[in-house]
Amino acid sequence: MNKKYEPLHDDFPATNVLKRSQAIFGRDYQMGIVVEECSELQKELLKNTNRKKDNLPEIIDETADVYIGLLHVIISYDINGPVAQRVKEKLDRLNERLKIRETTSSVEEYTKAIEAKKAKEAQKVK
């Protein structure tokens, strides 16, 4: 990749700790932990939203674990720049969709507007 990206974490202080962890435990082991932590966060979020459980401390704890796990993924695959670029693109797209939603009166109208925008963009590609 020749693109220049603005990194998510440039010289992030935890980088050395995370690299040591991968050197000691191995990348595959760490990726398994990341999957496990994502599952634990999912469980806590579902408890909160579906069962209305007051579990903010657990959500904070699992979010921190997932955040560390995502840093493991970024470092392990050396994808800091490309991930930063995709985050920017996805936030830009969300911002555009929010602008559309703010000008529509219903979810149905919003959905039609998004579909029309996609069709228009597809025509540009042809």
Give residue spans per PLM region.
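Flexible "arm" and connector segments at domain edges
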Residues: M1-K126
